[in-house]
A protein has these predicted regions:
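Catalytic cores of the polymerase beta-like nucleotidyltransferase superfamily
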Residues: 1-592
Length: 592
């Protein structure tokens, strides 16, 4: 059942906005209402609302004390952010409007401000985002309750009567456009008609209510739902408002938003169920696409090419950080969008790998590793790195097909066609096209280039593993190294090859445990933490400033990382560097 009882969590927002705007003739709409009803949040932080009126006039009359505020004049969007120290709330008002002429598949050519809420509904993307909320203090009839309403009964009454009053939740739902035209003329509640709706005794009461017991004062929660979004929330269907082709051709970003909504909402529902620790055999109903909506998404997939890349990036980032990336990639593939967004990944399909390492093609291995990674790591950049960590194998394996000798293979693996390097190059190309920042791309590339490093550490004997891990920690920091170890675990789990015993991850888990111990006992030890500085080395060895000083500090650091407590002493460092310089001098003489 939907969480109608949680609607009261929206009352403080309604009260706050009433004070700021100076009137209560507005409606919360969109994600805040959807998430409250689904139970995926009790405290939404992004509150979208709408009302009738000219945006400039509304903006002028807002009480701006204690809030940051700005208006986007072209589309009339007004943003209000409370200035409280720990505030994360944002309110965004877009006045009721109608739109025409979406010639660029994104922005309307003309906007008409309106006082018709039913007209505003028609410009919304999906039915589950077109549920409007308001509230009203009034006296309502109280009936003796016979039984609790269930989902089947709720939908039956709504479909027949067009409205229902849920006494337990003090919630009134109205879907009938005929009733709504009388309830909200000019986008303002007609309280007389509201009383009329509550006072009559339709099937909405007869099914589960007995005799009338009088009236009581309540804070009535009102849901205005002409697009029948309640039905789709109950049945977990993503459906466009009106004709799907029209909706997607008006605004092509809706194609990707639709995939993201289904993906992220399902992840939230699964997470909520796990937190409740209910019976693991209980089934959770998850969102799927209404057939015509999905058919339209697939047939209009090429419209994705018309969308501004920064908007695509925003949708992908939300899905990869909040949702199920593995599932999203599957949807993108089925909707023929994968090759548009991630071309290097699409090319890995049907490229077989050496059976002794991988029983699957490159693509299958990659998405399996992504599946395992998302269970242990939520960092969206790490997840994107996992998505591209092996895409360079396409070029590497193409060279293998030329019957190279062992020496030629050795040279290939030492060069740019080694998939650790070529994958990073391909990631840079594809993520730059998606408008990822230079910093984000560098981070993704770093994980790709280093994704074999944990394997290499495990090849060392146990005595040297701690030193190698300290070196990696010194260079990259705890969070990056921990992420690399997660990538390593997921990479191994994605092999599914009994010959490699990939299910035994005890050594990789040992590295994670060792990393935590080093971090807690020693922290990230870097050259600046050495007992000697560059100037000490210059003075001790009578050297001038130059490249050699940095090299000697690196030599010292490499030595000290073997046992920080014992070796980070000036006399030991100088003795080690003296031997190093002596060896250098000998090599130079041999070169002469």
């Amino acid at each position: 059942m939907l969480h109608f009882n949680n609607l009261k969590k929206l009352i403080p927002h309604h009260v706050f906005l009433t004070k700021k705007i100076g009137k209560s003739d507005f409606f919360l709409v969109g994600g805040c209402v959807r998430e409250i009803l689904l139970g995926t949040t009790k405290n939404p932080l992004d509150i979208d609302f709408t009302m009738a009126g000219n945006p400039l006039e509304i903006y002028e009359n807002i009480d701006k004390d204690g809030i940051s505020h700005f208006i986007t004049e072209k589309y009339g969007t007004i943003t209000l952010i409370p200035k409280d120290k720990d505030n994360e709330l944002k309110y965004e008002l877009t006045p009721l409007r109608a739109e025409t002429g979406y010639q660029d598949c994104r922005h309307p050519e003309e906007i008409f401000w309106s006082d018709d809420l039913l007209l505003d509904v028609q410009r919304r993307d999906f039915t589950i985002n077109a549920i409007y909320y308001t509230q009203q203090k009034l006296k309502t009839p109280v009936y003796e309750q016979k039984k609790i309403i269930n989902e089947e009964m709720l939908l039956k009454i709504l479909n027949k009567e067009g409205f229902i009053y849920l006494q337990n939740n003090e919630t009134l739902i109205i879907q009938s456009q005929k009733l709504l035209s009388q309830l909200i003329p000019n986008a303002k509640l007609d309280t007389d008609f509201l009383y009329y709706l509550l006072d009559i005794q339709p099937y909405a009461y007869i099914f589960w209510a007995g005799e009338k017991k009088g009236k009581k004062q309540i804070q009535l929660q009102i849901l205005i739902d002409p697009a029948l979004g309640i039905q789709d929330l109950v049945l977990k269907k993503l459906r466009t408002v009106g004709n799907p082709d029209t909706r997607f051709q008006e605004d092509s970003l809706r194609l990707l938003r639709g995939l993201r909504f289904v993906n992220v909402l399902n992840q939230k529902l699964l997470t909520r169920t796990k937190k409740k620790k209910s019976d693991p055999t209980d089934k959770v109903r998850l969102f799927d696409f209404e057939p015509e909506t999905w058919k339209s998404i697939k047939s209009n997939h090429n419209l994705l090419k018309t969308i501004a890349k920064e908007r695509i990036k925003e949708e992908l980032t939300k899905a990869f950080s909040q949702g199920n990336p593995f599932g999203l990639v599957g949807l993108l593939d089925e909707a023929e969008m994968l090759v548009i967004l991630f071309p290097a990944l699409a090319l890995t399909k049907h490229i077989d790998q050496p059976i002794r390492y991988h029983p699957f093609d490159i693509y299958s291995h990659i998405i399996l590793t992504l599946y395992h990674l998302q269970a242990i790591n939520t960092n969206y950049l790490v997840r994107f790195a996992m998505l591209y960590h092996d895409v360079g194998k396409v070029g590497q394996y193409a060279e293998y097909g030329k019957n190279l000798s062992k020496e030629e293979i050795r040279i290939l693996l030492a060069g740019p066609l080694n998939h650790r390097f070529s994958s990073a190059v391909l990631a840079e190309e594809d993520f730059r096209k998606l408008w990822f920042s230079h910093k984000e791309i560098e981070e993704i590339q770093r994980y790709i280039r280093e994704h074999h490093t944990p394997w290499e550490i495990l090849l060392w004997n146990p005595q040297n593993r701690a030193k190698r891990l300290r070196k990696l920690l010194s260079d990259a920091g705890f969070e990056r190294v921990n992420n690399l170890l997660d990538i390593n675990i997921a990479d191994r789990m994605g092999m599914y090859n009994p010959l490699q015993n990939a299910s035994d991850l005890s050594d990789s888990r040992y590295l994670k445990k060792l990393l935590l111990e080093i971090e807690q006992e020693e922290g990230q030890f870097r050259s600046k933490d050495l007992a000697v500085k560059g100037r000490d080395i210059m003075e001790y060895f009578n050297l001038k400033p130059g490249k050699i000083i940095g090299e000697l500090l690196e030599v010292a650091l490499d030595r000290v990382l073997g046992d920080i407590k014992k070796r980070n002493k000036a006399d030991q460092i100088f003795a080690n560097l003296a031997n190093h310089l002596k060896n250098l001098e000998g090599k130079n003489k041999e070169g002469l």
